[in-house]
């Protein structure tokens, strides 16, 4: 392995680990806030302050975007992300975070299957074995701690499905897509939908520290 390849690998590992850490921080904050306010307000804060952070970034750096490119797919991707977040935050109030992540990590398996079927990606024998092992470990880990026949299981199941479809559509347009366009559409779509909803269902926030949590989730989501 060359030095450039090693540097790239280290960068990928660092970014992946950092992204996962931020996801855990956001979900942990959401789990806490869901106990002190309606979940819909926590979801609103995640997207509204994501949008505010995005506006500040655009004012400072003024990146050029083509928001008309792949418009329909961008809207679909944004709705998938908003749906995944809504169900994820709801599932956090019903199950342990570790159990939810066990289910959530089935998303790469779903993405691989979708890519193989629709994009004709070739799955190697090693890849198939790894997917089967992944699925088996998910089923094994799910059984002892979660009620498989519980209707509430729909909440942790929906997020990986939506996330897998989100990644699939991302891969579909990856060669003709600007990364910040996706961030823009996701922030605007989520903020718009939940701002309209909570304007009719707002519950006063009793402690100012909860606002810090809402802002933090928006920043985590933006990063």
What is each residue range found by the language model?
Residues 88-90, 107-129:
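C-terminal transmembrane-helix exit sites in multi-pass transporters
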Residues 20-25, 55, 78-86, 108-113, ...:
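Hydrophobic/small/kink-forming positions within alpha-helical transmembrane segments
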Residues 11-18, 58, 64-87, 151-159, ...:
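Loop-to-transmembrane-helix transition segments
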Residues 28-39, 93-96, 139-151, 198-214:
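Membrane-interface helix termini and inter-helical loops of multi-pass transporters
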Residues 12, 36-83, 162-166, 185-201:
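Transmembrane alpha-helices of multi-pass small-molecule transport proteins
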Residues 1-41, 147-172, 216:
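Glycine-/small-residue-enriched transmembrane alpha-helix faces in small-molecule transporters
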Residues 35-41, 87-104, 175-180:
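Structural motif at transmembrane-helix junctions in multi-pass transporters
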Residues 126-142:
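Hydrophobic transmembrane alpha-helices of multi-pass small-molecule transport proteins
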């Amino acid at each position: 392995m060359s030095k450039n390849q090693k540097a790239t690998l280290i960068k990928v590992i660092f970014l992946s680990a950092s992204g996962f850490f931020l996801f855990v921080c956001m979900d942990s904050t959401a789990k806490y806030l869901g106990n002190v306010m309606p979940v819909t307000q926590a979801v609103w804060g995640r997207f509204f302050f994501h949008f505010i952070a995005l506006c500040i970034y655009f004012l400072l750096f003024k990146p050029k975007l083509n928001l008309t490119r792949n418009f329909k797919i961008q809207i679909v991707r944004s709705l998938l992300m908003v749906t995944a977040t809504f169900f994820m935050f709801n599932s956090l109030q019903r199950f342990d975070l570790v159990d939810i992540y066990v289910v959530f990590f089935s998303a790469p398996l779903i993405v691989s299957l979708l890519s193989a079927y629709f994009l004709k990606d070739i799955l190697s024998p090693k890849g198939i074995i790894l997917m089967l092992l992944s699925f088996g470990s998910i089923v094994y880990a799910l059984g002892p701690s979660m009620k498989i026949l519980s209707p509430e299981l729909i909440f942790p199941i929906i997020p990986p499905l939506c996330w897998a479809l989100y990644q699939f559509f991302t891969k579909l347009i990856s060669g003709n897509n600007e990364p910040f366009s996706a961030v823009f559409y996701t922030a605007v779509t989520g903020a718009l939908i939940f701002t309209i909803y909570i304007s009719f269902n707002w519950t006063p926030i009793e402690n100012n520290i909860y606002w810090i949590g809402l802002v933090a989730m928006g920043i985590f989501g933006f990063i």
